[in-house]
Amino acid sequence: SRRQRQMCIRDRNKPLLLIQISNIFCLLGMMLKGYLNYYYCVYNWGSLGYMTVLNLINLVGMVVGALIFTFLSQHIGKKNCMFLFAGLMTISSLVLYFAGYHNAIVLFATSSVSTVCVGAVMVCVNAMMMDTIEYGEWKTGQRNEAMITSTRCFVTKCVMAVAGIAVAAVIGLTGYIPQETVQPVNVLNSFHFVYTLVSAGIIILAVVPMLFYKLTEKRHAEICLLYTSPSPRDISG
């Protein structure tokens, strides 16, 4: 059956499975901050204007991150890029966490670094996912590009739902008072904690599967040359 074929492809394409797991955490960390952005800016920082600035930073930063990744990955590889940008994002989140929600310059500076890193990591994940297409074809004899793309879309929708539930839980369980301009300190601290440390921790979890990811650029190039040979599955790997 079609489902059995898909499970077989998944089981034989370990790099794809690792990338999908990493993609889940990347999306969750990014969406968690995005969904909480309004509450964080309005209540922790006291003005919706901060959200406007942060959205502009996100728009520019994501593009800059993608461009930096495109250049840097040619020199140090995609996997190392992911480690680098995840580390930088963690550092920037730690700086914002310990600085608190009182210094706008720190907020904008750390958000700029984090957004550039998120942009680079997301492009990195997508690029590595595309590499698994040839790997899967080499392993199974089937080029399942459509299945990989549809699975990624399904994962994105699921993560959106989970992130929405998580933010709703944070708002509901911390004592948030609707329509109050001033929230209790524990609510503000919870928003700050989730916005900084929790989102950074999730990005770190996204890196863990990459420790087991063995499909390097060199190996991918070899497979691109070999999987069309008469006996592609006789090649070790």
Short names for language-model regions:
Residues 1-9, 230-237:
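Single conserved hydrophobic/aromatic residue that forms the stacking wall/gate
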Residues 2-6, 10-224:
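Membrane-embedded alpha-helical bundles of multi-pass transporters/translocases
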